Amino acid sequence: MNKEERAKRQSKIRNFSIIAHIDHGKSTLADRILEKTNALTQREMKAQLLDSMDLERERGITIKLNAVQLNYKAKDGEEYILHLIDTPGHVDFTYEVSRSLAACEGAILVVDAAQGIEAQTLANVYLALDNNLEILPVINKIDLPSADPERVRQEVEDVIGLDASEAVLASAKAGIGIEEILEQIVEKVPAPAGDSEEPLQCMIFDSLYDPYRGVIAYIRVVNGTVKVGDKVRMMATGKEFEVTEVGVFTPKTTQRDELTVGDVGFLAASIKNVGDTRVGDTITHAKRPAAEPLAGYRKLNPMVFCGLYPIDSARYNDLRDALEKLELNDSALEFEPETSQALGFGFRCGFLGLLHMEIIQERIEREFKIDLITTAPSVIYKVYLTNGEDVIVDNPSNMPDPQSIDRVEEPFVKASIMVPNDYVGAVMEICQGKRGTFIDMQYLDETRVTLTYEIPLSEIVYDFFDQLKSNTKGYASFDYELIGYKPSKLVKMDILLNNEQVDALSFIVHRDSAYDRGKVIVEKLKELIPRQQFEVPIQATIGNKVVARSTIKAMRKNVLAKCYGGDISRKRKLLDKQKEGKKRMKSVGSVEVPQEAFMAVLKMDDN
């Protein structure tokens, strides 16, 4: 293509994504848009086409982002090229959303006509505004009997401050209003800015590993043009590769000769290691590099850590391979090897949040058929010592000796919880029980309130979300952002079995709830550990102080069975002999902790 053709083509490109709260109908709308633009034959069409992972289809949530190129003939008779980038809606995957928004010029904001605006909708709108996107409000599900589009329109204006007078009323399920949405995209979303003659700048917004072609980078071209055979350089790592293919997704991968400004597509360059294509990095030409990388987005830091161990220790290497493969597509997953006396060899993994953690575990068990034990999730603590040093602790067993600790700080989050009036009391109770500090309360309309709390991340990690949903009958929606570290009275609690510490059961807990938590765990272990030939004490300790204890009684043989009546001294002798034996056994005996006991303690909640 020459320069004029490229410029004409560029003016016809529209890049947009769809943002919404979970279940407001984002994936269904994407399906209808694909159908309307004839991207697929009727036969290929299936519900939630862009959610390609089994897990996504099963849970009905979008986890990974996806991109498609569509051709649309507008009412003005011109052919437009639309790039739809699908995004997840769940709080743990906000990062996936921010990546896809960075590759767009516009966003369709889908709001449920019955439920109105929810916490995640707001969080994503702010992300879109940060990226200066043109936002087109769409009120979806207007065919529901409980729909109230006028109220929702008012809500969009009041809460977000967008002009909703031209908001499209649609029903993705029934296919109402889809054409109006497409016309608005063509009309209101700006064409990509950028110059095809400038040095190449492509942003990587995702990557995927293909066993035959190596790493495939999903890119959005911001400036310049990239063709097969070009030598390209990754600006973050400085590594160079030769491009073997470029193309676009029409959901299927379709090869093209070149990608130019505004194109969203893929690039393969027989890259072996996914670490070389960091998400958010800029690709440029090796011969004529760009002066500086694009304002990439931040490196994502995991918030929640836990240990993953294979139940069958022989499968340690398989687990490593599984984690490496998942890491290829999941830039936020981090892991490093770790060993535990109780569980053997495994990995310490970092995740964005609890849903992310669950999904990774489920994918390992499903796709790689490895059974896992997971230790209790923990967060990163900063520990300041009396000698002036500070240590970062992401694993309770690395906590320094209590005598040498000056203070401990833990991460706090600002949680915004949207909830109907009737449940405000219940939500406040949960937040206070989780050591939350009340910050603010705002009424969105007559029926809904936003509560803002500062809560320690370690309390949210545990079972906050489940409690929130069950105590508000599922009506509360919840979003959080990290605000930094604050000092807390935290202690490390160890569990001793027969006076030996079990490292996998150590955890860090707030001093006020330490006693209760210790007591519950000790009782639970007493039920689950089988009786031994000797008496086994179970203790919960903080430093050298035992805060809770319980004892598993010994099994014993009736040594007096052979005595018919007879003298007490004879019986004494036999009983004392038995006692001696038990004592000796206790000093050398070791106690195996069964799998169920670990699982039960890790799953235990605070009540």
Swiss-Prot record:
Enzymatic reactions: GTP + H2O = GDP + phosphate + H(+)
Membrane disposition: Peripheral membrane protein
The keyword Hydrolase belongs to this UniProt entry's keyword annotation: yes
Gene3D superfamilies associated with the record: 3.30.70.240, Elongation factor 4, C-terminal domain, Elongation Factor G (Translational Gtpase), domain 3, P-loop containing nucleotide triphosphate hydrolases, Translation factors
UniProt keyword annotations, A-Z: Cell membrane, GTP-binding, Hydrolase, Membrane, Nucleotide-binding, Protein biosynthesis
E.C. no: 3.6.5.n1
GO molecular function: GTP binding; GTPase activity; ribosome binding; translation elongation factor activity
Domain (tr-type G): residue spans on this chain: 11-193
Binding-site residues, GTP: 23-28, 140-143
Functional summary from the UniProt entry: Required for accurate and efficient protein synthesis under certain stress conditions. May act as a fidelity factor of the translation reaction, by catalyzing a one-codon backward translocation of tRNAs on improperly translocated ribosomes. Back-translocation proceeds from a post-translocation (POST) complex to a pre-translocation (PRE) complex, thus giving elongation factor G a second chance to translocate the tRNAs correctly. Binds to ribosomes in a GTP-dependent manner.
Family membership noted in the UniProt record: Belongs to the TRAFAC class translation factor GTPase superfamily. Classic translation factor GTPase family. LepA subfamily.
Protein's name in the database: Elongation factor 4
Name of the gene encoding the protein in the UniProt record: lepA
